[in-house]
């Protein structure tokens, strides 16, 4: 494998889907929030992305079979919105800047092909003392201010590293609208509590009230076993 490769499982029928990213990172906040959305919407995996930029290991499943690291794309429909949800095993090494740009471009091309023009990225924000605060950055000041009343605080004068920041920035250059939700975390272990706060803020912002009640002790940190 010398370049990113998409494996399409089926082609979902989606209309103007919202693209939601939640990958590994600080406290795995984004990943847990994304998997909460997958569970809440009963989303189905429809594509996988493999790339030579991912770390050099394989994941071993419960049945003893192995596979390389991957990203997975899930499709979901609710009465309010259609979604493409991205989550995955890992990210390219932080020092490999070219790999991050390349894979983020591939992801945005893929989402654009399916009709996406609005993106939500989710991740963690390092804080010495966490208070379940959720911060927002956006592609425009107007958009950021619009969602302050939905439970988020403005994130200013900082950086958003990895795919969570880069996807939003590159999407803006394509003319998309979008936001980033950041949950405060110490960065140690899986932060289920703040991930749940990010998920609830996302639902408030998108006005998509899901019936499912997710307790922070039950926030999914792994893919459903039937989809490994």
Model regions and ranges:
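Non-transmembrane, aqueous-exposed alpha-helical and coiled segments at domain scale
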Residues: 80-81, 93, 142, 148
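Hydrophobic/aromatic beta-strand patches that form the interior of the parallel beta-sheet core
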Residues: 47, 84-86, 118-120, 177-182
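A conserved C-terminal secondary-structure "cap"
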Residues: 189-228
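Secondary-structure boundary elements
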Residues: 44, 106-119, 172-177, 204-210
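Internal, conserved structured core segments that host functional sites
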Residues: 94-142
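Short coil/turn connectors at secondary-structure junctions
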Residues: 14-17, 43, 80-82, 114-117, ...
């Amino acid at each position: 494998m010398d370049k990113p490769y998409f494996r399409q499982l089926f082609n979902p029928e989606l209309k103007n889907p919202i693209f939601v990213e939640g990958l590994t990172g600080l406290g795995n906040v984004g990943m847990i929030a994304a998997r909460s959305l997958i569970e809440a919407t009963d989303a189905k995996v429809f594509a996988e992305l493999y790339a030579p930029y991912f770390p050099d290991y394989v994941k071993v499943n419960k049945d003893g079979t192995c596979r390389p690291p991957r990203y997975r794309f899930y499709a979901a429909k609710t009465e309010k919105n259609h979604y493409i949800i991205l989550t995955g095993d890992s990210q390219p090494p932080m020092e490999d800047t070219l790999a991050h740009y390349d894979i983020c471009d591939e992801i945005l091309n893929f989402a654009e092909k399916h009709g996406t023009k609005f993106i939500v990225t989710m991740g963690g924000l390092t804080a010495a003392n966490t208070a379940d605060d959720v911060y927002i950055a956006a592609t425009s000041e107007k958009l950021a201010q619009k969602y302050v009343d939905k439970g988020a605080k403005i994130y200013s004068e900082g950086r958003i590293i990895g795919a969570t920041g880069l996807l939003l920035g590159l999407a803006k250059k394509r003319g998309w609208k979008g936001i980033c939700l950041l949950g405060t975390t110490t960065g140690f272990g899986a932060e289920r509590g703040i991930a749940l706060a990010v998920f609830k803020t996302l639902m408030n912002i998108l006005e998509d009230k899901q019936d499912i009640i997710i307790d922070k002790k039950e926030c999914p940190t792994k893919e459903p076993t039937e989809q490994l």
